[in-house]
Amino acid sequence: MKYDMNHRKNSDDTPPASRTVKEMMAEFQNKLDDGDNRFRKQPPPPPSPRRAPPPPPHRKPASLSPPPDDENTIRPPSSSESSENIPEEPQELITPNTTRRSLGPKPTVAPKPLFLNGLLPSSSTSDVSSQNSPKCDPHPSCTTPTILVSPATSEYSNGVFFGANETNGSGVKDRARQLVNMGFVPRMQNGGTGTPSERPISQVSTLSQVSDEFDEGDTSASDEESMNSEKHLRRHRHEDDFDELPLPKNERKTTTVAATHSEIMNEMEHLFVRGGKKNNGVHKQQRRQSNIDEIPSDVGKLRDNRKGRHNSLFVSPTSGMSSSSTDDFSRITSMTSDRSSILTSHSGGEDSTDGASPVPDYETGDEKDDQRLKKLHYAAVEFLKVQNNYVQYLKEMAVLYPEYMERFGKRVGRDLLASHNGHENVVLQIKKIMVQILPIHEMLLKEIDKVCSNWDSRYPNMSKTIGTFADFLKCCQPFLDNKADFLNKLLQLRNEDKEFDEATYMFETEVFKRGKKGAVIQQLDQVHQNFMRYKLLMLRYSEYLIDDCDEKEKAQEAIQKLENVTQAVNQKMGLPTTEELTKLYYRFQCQFNVLEPGRVLIRQSEVMKQTRKELQPRYLVLFTDYLWICRVSSSGQFDINRSYRIPLEYMKFERMEEDERIRCLQIRSRVKSALIIFSSEKERNQWTDDLTKAQYDRKSYKRRQSTAVQRHDENKKKMNKLLMLTPEVPDASDLERPQLIDSRSRSMSCESQDELSSVPVTPLDNGEIDETLGFGEVTRNGSGKKPPSEMIKPVWLPDNISNECLMEGCSTEFNIINRRHHCRDCGWLICKFCKGQAPLSKYDFTKQNVCSECFDRHYKAYKDGVLFPSKNMIVQSDETILVKIGKRNDKEIVDPRKLFKAPVNYGFRHRNVEEKRAQSIVFGRVYLSFRSRKTETVRHALLRRDDLKLVFYKAELDSKSVLELLIYGYFYRETPLDDGWLFELVHRNQIRTDDTKDDVISFRVDNSASAKKWSAAFADKLELDPTRG
């Protein structure tokens, strides 16, 4: 650095001789050595309006700053200047004969280069240009040439100080001593025997500090500049304060159960954070001290921000210990987890894999190959995600759940893990087996982590790890053999032990956040479903491998190993094989998780569905929680957009008992209603039995869940009465998780409780008086039970079931002009004259086609004020009422009167179609044939009871017959055929001639049950033909 002192005039006013910079610096140093302290640093400027940050516990504040000046150069003081403003400061005198002491301690953490005045070095010459200076101009008093200050060390080998062209070591040391005297570099206190002082925190320093607030130290900058620089200079927390981070604590005063839960979580927090990391604290301290001796090789050079050293002391926002993690699950999992950030963090981003390095683009020159390599990278990282989640689940069930139950029992004064019915507690039994499973999967997780940490899709090597551990997966067999017993014991214990059930409920809802409500019982299937996941992951992984490569062959071998293991386990358990589930998973186009915990495949088969015009093929899949009615595409996969997923608890099914529909099953639900036709009556009965059992189990689970919510609500109400000593209105900040969970549980229960479910729910009012409506009647508030006709979608009658309108009094026959219509409320077949329009609740109160009878019912409900829920009504200022209709995301406000359109045939009712069947001896579908015709015609025939007339109809529900025959005097013949039974009615004339022919009517019945009824009716009313030999 040059110090231009030529502008100073000497006291004798003689022009100074031309001297070099070295000579001027030597003269300046002699003055300092003689005790002239006028060039020492000035007192610090007045403090900034912003509060300075508190120093860390291990640091001592050093408020050294360069002296202000008016020029761009440093001038020696004149004799006229007063020395009163120069503070006397004891310091170490440095002479050429004295031994130079250490210039200060080495930094604890290697800092980035410190650039004075915010300027970057652009050259190594003495005069450095400022073309790379930041946008804000530096302070006028600090516009000296750029100086790059390295951390205080015992050697200064950089040639960028002062005269870069001077290479002698003594010159560099002299310049270093000048930096010490000027305050840019810390000095040793008390002659070097005391505690060393740290380098002062500069306004451009990026070292991590404890406080989140900081002081720039520059009072000349504007507030806007300060705010902009604050974003880039935010201090991070120091490692010493890592264990002191305040964890969120839910202070609840609502129930004893909630208070007990809070105490337990606080204890477990202390157990895992304070106690479990005592040894790690020593290691961290040693590692931090060891960093003192580590000086990176690139100190003094410009480093890329992306390649900067990662500060392990800083807790990233994606970590489990972030300040935003306020729930108990995040706290406990972050306490117990000792894995790396790649396992514990779950950051978003397309190119990010759970906190790991971004997935590279693999620029090979071929775009398709680049995409393949990138997908292969994602497939490899997916192994790590799945295995990490599974290991975490095992830890929660084997460690966290028993510990939680034990501590909860101590709070309530009894042992919740005591023996039950003379046997060891089921929680301890589960713990014993899962503790044996956990080490194997931790080893597998470690190996997968090792592979993923050095992953390169051009050299894949995941198959070897999976193939090696495939045989060890059999360690889960003992748990799978006893899983059904564990399930029954848990159910029994929760039903009998109220406190055990409450503790489990709190653990499920507050800590164990897996699946719906995080049910512990439902998650027991995780162990078995883990088998299936490995093969699915390997299949996806192998898809992106190049054919005829070694890794492809190893992947196929690993897949076969996994298949053998899962086949053996599934055969022993009597469950579907992995291959079957894998095929089903891909038929769902990977859009439905067949391996969801608690979800088991029960049955699947091809069926036929009766549509309004014809029979169409469908594929029926039954799980423990859903029934799928799938439309199969030409490729064999399911068309998800045109398939229906029906929850079992919201469904009704009914066997059709008519002879022609003995293979049919009618399914009705709020999602979809249909008539399913199976291949045989036996298959229909098997499906009905499985549906009945699956629905019962599902409702039982919902009932237990709702009962737990009710108990929690009752306890909360009781404790509120005891704790409400002073009337206080809780604000929004007091609404902690239990209240939110309870309200959500109640709403879910209320939505699932209708006429189809026997699950008990919290009592809710069915209506409320709303005087603003003007009707003076009780209106529904939208949360009570609704009639089945308002919730269940109807099964439409097929078009060929009738050739005429089915409304009583209407004689319209369907043809090209008069087309068929279906009522959306009851599924009835009507004509255009009997069709009206009305809003239906099952279609979100949108306007739909209805028959005359349904229109009358809904219009009467509208007049009575009970059709629309009060939450859907909007009262205008002029007392007119508007309603909200449509789906949740597509609401529309309309005038309710515009939603109704009366039919032409107003007031007509449904025809009694059962009357015809009730007045007959036998009724069914037949195939009528005449002697003059060789073809058969489908007809529906009945034998009338009162007059013994055989009547044939064109359609099943027609009222007009096409043929009537009085069967008195007829003989009958019956002949068994391969496709049914043939019945012939023969009438002979009393006068017979050679050309006389018998009058014969024949028809075939394809249903065996219907054929028996026809045979019995003819045998009772007619005589057998005697001519039949």
UniProtKB/Swiss-Prot annotation:
Binding site for Zn(2+) 1: C810, C831, C834
Biased composition (Basic and acidic residues): 1-12, 20-39
Compositionally biased residues, Polar residues: 141-155, 200-211, 335-347
Region (Disordered): 1-155, 185-254, 279-370
Residues annotated to bind Zn(2+) 2: C823, C826, C851, C854
InterPro entries (UniProt xref): DBL_dom_sf, DH_dom, FYVE_RhoGEF_PH, PH-like_dom_sf, PH_domain, Znf_FYVE, Znf_FYVE-rel, Znf_FYVE_PHD
Phenotype of the disrupted gene, per the record: RNAi-mediated knockdown reduces lifespan.
Keyword Transmembrane helix: no
UniProt protein name: FYVE, RhoGEF and PH domain-containing protein tag-77
Organism: Caenorhabditis elegans
Lineage: Eukaryota, Metazoa, Ecdysozoa, Nematoda, Chromadorea
